[in-house]
Amino acid sequence: MSERIFIGVAWPYANSQLHLGHVAGAYLPADIFARYHRTRGDEVLMVSGSDMHGTPITIRAEQEGITAAEVAERYHQRFMASWPKLGISWDFYTSTATANHARTAQEMFLSLYEKGYIYKNTVCQPFCSHCNRFLPDRYVEGTCPHCKYEGARGDQCDNCGKPLNAAELLNFRCKNCGNPPEFRETEHFFLKLSAFEEELIRWVETKTHWRTNVLNFTLRYLKEGLKDRAITRDLDWGVPLPLPGYEGKRLYVWFEAVIGYLSASKEWAASKGQPNAWQKYWGGDTKSYYFIGKDNIPFHTIIWPAMLMGKGGLNLPYDVPSNEYLTTESQKFSKSRNNAIWVDDVLSRYGVDTLRYLLSANMPESSDTDFSWREFVRRNNDELVATYGNLAQRVLTMVCRNYDNKVPEYGELDERSLTLIEKTAAMLCETDKALYNCNFREAIRLAMALAQEANRYLDEKAPWKEIKVDKAAAARSLYVAMVALSGLRVAFYPFLPESSGRLSTYLGFGSELEKESWILKMPVVGQELTPPEPLFKKLEDSVVEEETARMGL
Ligand SMILES: Nc1ncnc2c1ncn2[C@@H]1O[C@H](COP(=O)(O)OP(=O)(O)OP(=O)(O)O)[C@@H](O)[C@H]1O
Ligand SMILES: [Zn+2]
């Protein structure tokens, strides 16, 4: 039975270009999941957009001496150019700078305000007398009170993932001038998170299908007790408050950005000329998945669900399959720390499927994972080229050369051949299960294992020898290997859409796998074929040194 799946993906801050951490953490797993469900025949809506607001952008603008709008627009355009190169198949990608988003965020604010879930309070906020302004979020740095990490910021600690208030930091200082701020009174609006504590605990306790790290982090956080959080800031960049008298304040970026999932869905519906079409993705038995890196967990398992509970009538997350960090030398890739490997740069030298393969096979699903150029080259050469690509190339070239560019007659199948076909069908069942449960590494491992199995079959049968004595036997071996390839193109499709599309045409099927289904399709005897080009290119070992030198390690 087909399902309806909503996929929300973290909104990247438009303060820098994309690095491999973003891809491995959020965008690639979301895209794999979307492509998989579309191929299964499910209805999918995958949305996100650039986060144009917040202090990461104003800080960058101040550093460069340009406006925040200019910074945000520049990186938004770069993201838009990167997505197709990466093969990220958005149903809709927008930004938080739209009038639709501001309106949706303001409506959410007012709805929660009217129900008493948002209230006003006077608080002490850090104020730098040297810079003469309040210091929101990332304008303050200091030591995390929980894990003692020294580079924690006024909104969150990147090391232990806990959201923070500036006043909780130890040894806090102004990011701009390094002086310790004083605390001054200012009025802010608060989200009454405490009102949702019990409902949230009851809800999270039913989420036994969540990843252990996500579930444990969330429960620990909830059981420490929820504090109400300020959701406005003294800033002039962001979505204005929908109430008169607060012109110098804006909605806090984290309250506002998560609303993007809803506003993007509405904008998608409007763009299709069906303004109500978003509703079916936010109600009924639609399952909502949110793909994010682990620093975003509390915003998606606590704050956003609390907002949705308060508003009512909209689906809560079904799953939040958050990834851990992609690291270099055990440090989180970070724009701000400048230790990143940039997506556009990598894609200017290597194929997109090589990158997607490495990041899928080494995805930081359950622990932080170091990116390694040695692994990049090894997996490309040993697995993509020697195991999978070579299998396709050997089989299809022989078929084209010896059987007049047509899928050959295979006659009667022997035991060994039937076993490979059965294993291929079983692999599709197992990858289906793994992908359904967001076990991406497991799924891609299963597919590559079948490619190895098909190579063993081919080496045993040796059609290049058979053909000299028994052309019909060689035809059978090659046909059965084509059946395995037919299964592989489906299983690899969510991960490696470019090469799967090509393999699909080489096998005589169309290139649009999403129009098929997650089953083993047999190549059609007599179908005309075009001789194949290699699916992947071998990389020189020198790539490891060149790239490591480029990173300055
Ligand atoms: N090294 C990483 N590994 C895994 N996920 C990451 C990594 N860096 C960022 N992400 C995820 O990518 C998404 C978008 O990131 P965002 O633009 O918010 O950057 P960020 O986390 O502030 O990164 P930075 O530290 O580079 O400024 C978020 O869900 C974030 O968790
Ligand atoms: Zn200062």
Curated annotation (Swiss-Prot):
This is Methionine--tRNA ligase. Is required not only for elongation of protein synthesis but also for the initiation of all mRNA translation through initiator tRNA(fMet) aminoacylation. Zn(2+) binds at C144, C147, C157, C160. It comes from Dehalococcoides mccartyi (strain CBDB1). GO terms for cellular component: cytosol. GO terms for molecular function: ATP binding; metal ion binding; methionine-tRNA ligase activity. Keywords: Aminoacyl-tRNA synthetase, ATP-binding, Cytoplasm, Ligase, Metal-binding, Nucleotide-binding, Protein biosynthesis, Zinc. A motif ('HIGH' region) lies at residues 12-22. Its EC number is 6.1.1.10. GO terms for biological process: methionyl-tRNA aminoacylation. The keyword Zinc applies. The keyword Isomerase does not apply. A motif ('KMSKS' region) lies at residues 332-336. Its cofactor is Zn(2+). The gene is metG. Monomer. ATP binds at K335. Binds 1 zinc ion per subunit. It is found in: Cytoplasm. It catalyses: tRNA(Met) + L-methionine + ATP = L-methionyl-tRNA(Met) + AMP + diphosphate. InterPro entries: Anticodon_Met, Met-tRNA_ligase_1, Met-tRNA_synth, Methionyl/Leucyl_tRNA_Synth, MetRS_core, MetRS_Zn, Rossmann-like_a/b/a_fold, tRNAsynth_Ia_anticodon-bd. Belongs to the class-I aminoacyl-tRNA synthetase family. MetG type 1 subfamily. Its main location: cytoplasm.
